[in-house]
């Protein structure tokens, strides 16, 4: 069976139009997704090492499997890697999270860097959050605790408590 060229061209054009101009808007966050997804949060500490930081922001990815990755707007001061952790449901619209990051120590001098040294390990920090998700699933509030540990894993100065507000990152 032979198809006229005009008919094939029309079919191809119709396909392209529906593909390009169809509903290309990203799907809304599915109902019941809970905390899973990408978030931007502001933290305010009342005590501890972070109490003096007034513009602390965190970016999170809460993975469906219960893991999370966090990075802050201060990860480069001093250089520290992102934090990694876990999260879980704790009731209707309530969640708990716990994540850990490494603390680094500044080199004593520039010569330490040129000799192959650099920012050496100087401990770790653990954040825990008690999160309450808004009814629409697009924002949250949280109570935050920070525990500081020295390089040997013993409690160190700087632990504190505060609050956070977060918003889901969306198109």
Model region roles, listed by residue range:
Residues 22, 26-30:
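Boundary at the C-terminal end of the N-terminal hydrophobic targeting segment
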């Amino acid at each position: 069976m032979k198809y006229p060229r005009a008919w094939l061209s029309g079919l191809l054009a119709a396909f392209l139009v529906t593909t390009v101009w169809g509903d290309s808007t990203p799907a809304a966050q599915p109902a019941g997704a809970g905390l899973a997804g990408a978030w931007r949060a502001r933290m305010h500490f009342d005590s501890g090492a972070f109490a003096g930081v007034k513009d602390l922001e965190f970016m999170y990815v809460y993975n469906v499997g219960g893991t999370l990755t966090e990075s802050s707007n201060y990860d480069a001061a001093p250089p520290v890697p992102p934090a990694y952790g876990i999260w879980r449901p704790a009731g209707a619209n309530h969640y708990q999270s716990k994540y850990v990051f490494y603390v680094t120590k500044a080199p004593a001098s520039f010569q330490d860097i040129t000799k192959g040294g650099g920012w050496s390990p100087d401990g770790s920090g653990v954040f825990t959050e008690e999160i309450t998700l808004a009814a629409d699933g697009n924002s949250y509030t949280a109570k935050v605790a920070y525990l500081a540990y020295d390089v040997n894993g013993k409690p160190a100065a700087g632990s504190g408590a505060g609050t956070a507000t977060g918003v889901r990152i969306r198109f």
